[in-house]
Each structure stands twice: as structure tokens, then as C-alpha cells.
């Protein structure tokens, strides 16, 4: 099948084109709504690039240029030649708990739950509507970050607030990065040559946004992110878990509005708030130069990660493997080392030489004697979205 995967942001569209699960092209529409907008399409088979720089006022104009570049490159005759288009959607809310093909109800529901993800869902919705208009005959699939976590038990996803907040307002833990956690856990099963239904793993997706997921027999049973992606780990610019009573205290102390506090927690906190950097390469360079705040930021990040992974050892009946994925998880050997060293008493024995090797691809980095496997699995959310889209089209 010919599948286009779209990740529509407020001012951008990222895309990948798959033909029978092989990436044929990828690209980006950036600075939508600005005069110096740019569209880049790259033929991934020969690395040839096709570019346009012009004013793009909206997503519809952006996708129209993408269509022109597909024709110019000869990769795809037209968007109507697609079998399907898979859209990454951050939040499905309580009712859209599974991936699905798009219809009028799905469009309305994505719009309704935009209040839960105001920075993401409206842009995703614009991407879907643009694709429907550009290629009416092509099936569109909504692939939700939250869907993988639909298998969490109620005692894991409920907050200890008055029940009406859940019952009437859908306030509960949803979890995110689901497409990534689903992909790497399935790849881990193949790597270990085990049935996914017999495997228990803890997946750590570590990027500027970061989350951990406890996966029992292929199903999510708990995850660190909650009602929003703010809960859980210390992240690049997000604070993660904190005492909620701090928020009214900060409001009175600094005279900040709710919106300003939200910005503070999401964009000015995390390791960035501690040391002024959110790129871990910069943080580790600063540590080498004796920057104590950078050292503190890294220690806080790793300590919170250790706490979550350790708690999921208690949640799972047994743990077969820990998976590191995402930009930091895949590339930062120091983070992996610091985390695994603190978990040694749980049967994790890291092979320091394997961990330090700068190689790409799926690999095992534990010592042969380790009771728990430690894997580095590069995530591929677009491939997973394409796979699920094919599956949904096949069923219908």
C-alpha cells in the first residue's frame, strides 16, 4: 500500500511516504503563515531533494506544494494515488480510545477534546481536513498517542479527585508517546525472539519530552505522563511531577496568571529551568567544564527516571527487559549508564563497553550475566503509524 503519514503542527507539516512499508520520501513544510515559508521533499532512495521557498498562508497551501513536489520528483503521481493517509493525533480523549478511520464523528470528537491538547489537536484537525479536501477518495486514519494506554486499569488512570471530575469532565490519566512505546516493545519482542504476549518490558522514551511505560504481555498497564504530557519525568523544558500546592503559592508570590504558570511549567522548567540548557550534549559539555547546575540537572533527570523504572518493576509481575529509545535514550550513553547503575540491585548489569559503542540500530547493551535485558531500540513512529493505517484500511 501507498501510505502518507502526516504530523501537522500549528505552523508546520512533517510527512513521510511509504510504499509497501518502505520509506520513499520524507519532508517538511515549515513557517506556515509567514512570508519565508519553505517546503522540502527528499527522495530517501537517492537523497535527491526538491525545495520551494514562498509564502504559505495555511495548511491547504502547504499540502498543495507537497503534491506539486511529489509530481516533480516522480515519486508519486498525485495525492489521489495514495491508498491511505495516517495522521498523528496527540489526544483522543475518553471516547476515541482506539485508532480509527476518520469520519464526521471522529472529526467532531477530535475537535471537542482539543481543550485537552490546545497546542496540538487543532493543528492535527487542520491537517486531516486539508487532506480530505486535497484527495477526497483517499482513506484517512487517526492514530492517537493516547490509544496504546487504553489498556491501563482504572486504578492506574484515575486521579484521587471527586469522582464527578472523571465522570462529567473526563479528567483522568491518558498517557502519551503511545505509538513509540508500542513500536519499540514490538521490536523488542522480535529482537529477543519472543512472543510479545509473553514479554514484560519497561520502555523509556527519552527526548525533549520523555515518558516511561510499563508493558505487560504487550499491553500498557501504566505510564508516567498523565492528563497532559506535563506529568511524570523531568524533561527538557517541562517540570514533570511536582506538589500541586506549589502552583497557587507561585501565583501569589510572583503575581502570575494560570496561563503564565502553564507556560512556566511547560516551556521554562525541566533541565532547562535548572541549568539554562535542554540539549543534553550541551549539559554534558557544561558538566565537563565544572558547571554544578548542569550536573544537578542531569542528576535530577536520571534520578526521576530511576524512580519511575523502579516503581514499574513493582507493578509488573516480572521484568524481562528495559528499552531505551528517543533521541536521548538512543544516543546518550551517560544517561543509560547512570540509570542502570542505580538499578543494579534489580538484576540489571550493564556492559559498559557495549553501552559506549557509537553504533546505530537495535542492540543489546547488558552484560551476559544480567537477569534483565537492556535494549536500545530506535523508535520509528511514522512506520508504526503507516502500519496501523494499512491495518485499518485492510479491515474496512
Curated annotation (Swiss-Prot):
GO terms for biological process: acetate metabolic process; acetyl-CoA biosynthetic process. The gene is ackA. Its EC number is 2.7.2.1. Homodimer. Catalyzes the formation of acetyl phosphate from acetate and ATP. Can also catalyze the reverse reaction. One of its GO terms (molecular function) is magnesium ion binding. Pathway: Metabolic intermediate biosynthesis; acetyl-CoA biosynthesis; acetyl-CoA from acetate: step 1/2. Its main location: cytoplasm. Its cofactor is Mg(2+); Mn(2+). The keyword Kinase applies. The keyword Magnesium applies. Keywords: ATP-binding, Cytoplasm, Kinase, Magnesium, Metal-binding, Nucleotide-binding, Transferase. Mg(2+) binds at residues 7, 381. It is found in: Cytoplasm. This is Acetate kinase. Mg(2+). Can also accept Mn(2+). The active site is at 145 (proton donor/acceptor). Belongs to the acetokinase family. GO terms for cellular component: cytoplasm. ATP binds at residues 14, 205-209, 279-281, 327-331. Pfam families: Acetate_kinase (PF00871). The record marks 177, 238 as: Transition state stabilizer. PANTHER family: ACETATE KINASE, ACETATE KINASE-RELATED. It is an enzyme of class 2 (transferase).
